[in-house]
Swiss-Prot record:
Disulfide bonds: none annotated. Keywords: Cell membrane, Cell projection, Cytoplasm, Cytoskeleton, Differentiation, GTP-binding, Hydrolase, Lipoprotein, Membrane, Methylation, Neurogenesis, Nucleotide-binding, Prenylation. A lipid is attached at residue 188 (S-geranylgeranyl cysteine). The lineage of its organism: Eukaryota, Metazoa, Chordata, Craniata, Vertebrata. Residues 189-191 form a propeptide. Its main location: membrane. This is Cell division control protein 42 homolog. The gene is CDC42. GO terms for molecular function: apolipoprotein A-I receptor binding; G protein activity; GBD domain binding; GTP binding; GTP-dependent protein binding; GTPase activity; identical protein binding; protein kinase binding. A motif (Effector region) lies at residues 32-40. Its EC number is 3.6.5.2. It comes from Gallus gallus. It is found in: Cell membrane; Cytoplasm, Cytoskeleton, Microtubule organizing center, Centrosome; Cytoplasm, Cytoskeleton, Spindle; Midbody. GTP binds at residues 10-17, 57-61, 115-118. It is a lipid-anchor.
Length: 191
């Protein structure tokens, strides 16, 4: 049985572990426990063939910056996560996470994943952001960043309501099995 290795990265507390636990067990964890390193495996059927989807959770905290890349070798696809209600986690996608994974695994496809979409319309969350002159990240803003950073695509979900959750992993599997064709570059030739 073929295994697909999927590694999840992103800032601490954006919901990486909840995403994985909600997907693999259909239960939402009730308390926050910072992750050092965990992995989960699920069997998925693709075109009538069984695949093992190996899901590797990582710690977003800076203390683990030297340890985290040890989980990167042989990765088939990365999920680069940010919370749609945490502008700093969105900023770190381009400042930290994409540079980190492309440094270690330059040819590995990645998806940009917006988490906690159930909070996008939550009045107290919106109020907290407004106090700092911020607002939730829109899908359009995230899609533009995904294009700019050459992500396979942008997907978003809520681990709490499970909205969009299965789609995140379906898209990750597709990206791993059918990595996008490298764009042909045209050279400028002066005669």
């Amino acid at each position: 049985m073929q295994t697909i290795k999927c590694v999840v990265v992103g800032d601490g507390a954006v919901g990486k572990t909840c995403l994985l636990i909600s997907y693999t067990t259909n239960k939402f964890p009730s308390e926050y426990v910072p992750t050092v390193f965990d992995n989960y495996a699920v069997t998925v059927m693709i075109g009538g063939e069984p695949y093992t989807l190996g899901l590797f959770d990582t710690a977003g905290q800076e203390d683990y910056d030297r340890l985290r890349p040890l989980s990167y070798p042989q990765t088939d696809v990365f999920l680069v996560c940010f919370s749609v209600v945490s502008p700093s986690s969105f900023e770190n996608v381009k400042e930290k996470w994409v540079p980190e994974i492309t440094h270690h695994c330059p040819k590995t496809p990645f998806l940009l994943v917006g988490t906690q979409i159930d909070l996008r319309d939550d009045p107290s969350t919106i109020e907290k952001l407004a106090k700092n002159k911020q607002k939730p990240i829109t899908p359009e803003t995230a899609e533009k960043l995904a294009r700019d950073l050459k992500a396979v695509k942008y997907v978003e979900c809520s681990a709490l309501t499970q909205k969009g959750l299965k789609n995140v992993f379906d898209e990750a599997i597709l990206a791993a099995l059918e990595p996008p064709e490298p764009k042909k570059t045209r050279r400028c030739v002066l005669l």
